[in-house]
């Protein structure tokens, strides 16, 4: 079977995905991390009126320099009265500008006396935040499909919006397979066993996307049990993610059970780690069959499953961020697969360097936990120390 480039696999997978557009409304305070279900435009100006950017004195610029009587005091949240000619208003940051004033003079530039203040010259408009200078009616604040951030919550609050229209979170069933797997916290390992890291790692990746996890646990290497579990997952979830059982071993039963109970494309991706990938459906529910090695499972989920899930959720998959970094390692990769090396990032600016996190084996989880990014190495490439390499930050995956 020919190797499939990652870009080709993504194009095929993403071309047919349809968004699940079930909508809900939630309180603004609970909306962070949710995917917005409608484009939101402003209906008012921010700020709603001219206000002071500083503590000081509101004046008509034509009246200064000179000594002026203080005619009123304007704290934030209180409506001013029109400024009397030839006077100054004591004003505080955020307070509305009195009609008749066109400048703010900083309090540290003023010489205060009993009921009067001596003020320097001022330019019209200085230290004034104009009405609508941040947001004007009709401005687009959030696009449909955008995943709401804490910054967005503040933005929407500033225009008084509450509640917010959002998409229902996808439900993603996560299951692993393998007689050798034991759950963390369940006791000591017996001979031949290892702890199951994939189930919890994949569930965490799903939750990080703002989606719900249906935990289907770990299945033994028994085809009937695996098949029955897949059908139960298909009935309960919007998508299924499995780890293990999609290679060509005698005990790799996930592949055969998907084929029996649905449809399957089995690809050999031209990436390392993460060559085997299954994508298809069970009883109409899409399924990703990821490799069993922990690093491979993590990376294929991040590179392949994540953009599909975001699009299915109604979101907007972003191009994978890459930035150039000087290599603090040397390596030759004569093969035919694009490689994603786990790298530690040190320094900043022109001194930023990427160094390998040790062994790059697909079973070495420390290579991921110690990494700040993935260095993308094209097939047939030799990298010398000091060469530029492209790095994908793990925080963006």
Model-derived regions, located:
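Phosphate-interaction motifs
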Residues: 1-162, 324
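Flexible glycine/proline-rich
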Residues: 24-29, 135, 259-397
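Solvent-exposed alpha-helices and their adjacent loops that cap or buttress functional pockets
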Residues: 50-52, 61-63, 80-84, 97-99, ...
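Short glycine-rich anion-binding loops that position phosphate/pyrophosphate groups of nucleotides
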Residues: 94-95, 179-180, 245-248, 292
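Phosphate-binding glycine-rich loops and their immediate beta-loop-alpha structural context
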Residues: 127-242
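Short Gly/Thr/Asp-enriched flexible loops that form oxyanion-binding sites at enzyme active sites
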Residues: 249-261
């Amino acid at each position: 079977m020919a190797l499939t480039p990652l870009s080709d696999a993504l194009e095929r997978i993403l071309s047919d995905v349809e968004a699940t557009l079930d909508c809900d409304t939630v309180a603004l305070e609970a909306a962070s991390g949710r995917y917005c279900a409608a484009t939101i435009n402003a209906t008012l100006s921010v700020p709603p009126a001219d206000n002071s950017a500083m503590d000081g004195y509101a004046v008509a610029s034509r009246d200064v320099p000179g000594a002026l009587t203080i005619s009123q005091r304007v704290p934030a949240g209180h409506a001013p009265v029109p400024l009397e000619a030839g006077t100054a208003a004591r004003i505080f940051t955020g307070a509305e500008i009195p009609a008749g004033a066109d400048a703010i003079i900083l309090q540290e530039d003023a010489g205060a006396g009993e009921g009067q203040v001596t003020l320097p010259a001022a330019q019209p408009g200085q230290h004034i935040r104009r009405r609508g200078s941040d947001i004007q009616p009709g401005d687009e604040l959030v696009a449909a499909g955008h995943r709401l951030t804490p910054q967005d919550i503040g933005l929407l609050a500033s225009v008084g919006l509450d509640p917010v229209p959002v998409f229902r979170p996808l439900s993603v069933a996560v299951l692993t397979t393998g007689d050798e797997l034991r759950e963390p916290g369940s006791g000591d390992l017996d001979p031949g066993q290892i702890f199951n890291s994939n189930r919890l790692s994949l569930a965490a990746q799903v939750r990080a996307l703002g989606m719900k996890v249906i935990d289907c646990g770990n299945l033994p290497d028994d085809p009937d049990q695996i098949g029955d579990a897949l059908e139960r997952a298909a009935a309960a979830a919007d998508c299924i993610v499995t780890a293990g059982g999609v290679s060509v071993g005698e005990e790799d039963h996930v592949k055969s059970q998907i084929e029996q109970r649905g449809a399957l494309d089995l690809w050999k991706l031209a990436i390392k780690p993460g060559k085997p990938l299954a994508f298809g459906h069970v009883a109409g529910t899409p399924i990703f069959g990821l490799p069993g090695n922990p690093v491979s499972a993590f990376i294929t989920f991040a590179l392949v499953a994540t953009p599909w899930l975001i699009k299915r959720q109604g979101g907007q998959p972003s191009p994978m961020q890459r930035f150039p970094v000087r290599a603090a390692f040397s390596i030759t990769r004569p093969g035919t697969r694009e490689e994603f090396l786990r790298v530690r990032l040190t320094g900043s600016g022109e001194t930023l360097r990427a160094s390998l996190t040790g062994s790059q084996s697909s079973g070495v989880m420390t290579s991921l936990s110690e990494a700040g990014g993935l260095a993308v190495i094209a097939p047939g490439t030799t990298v010398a120390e000091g060469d530029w390499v492209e790095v994908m930050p793990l925080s963006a995956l």
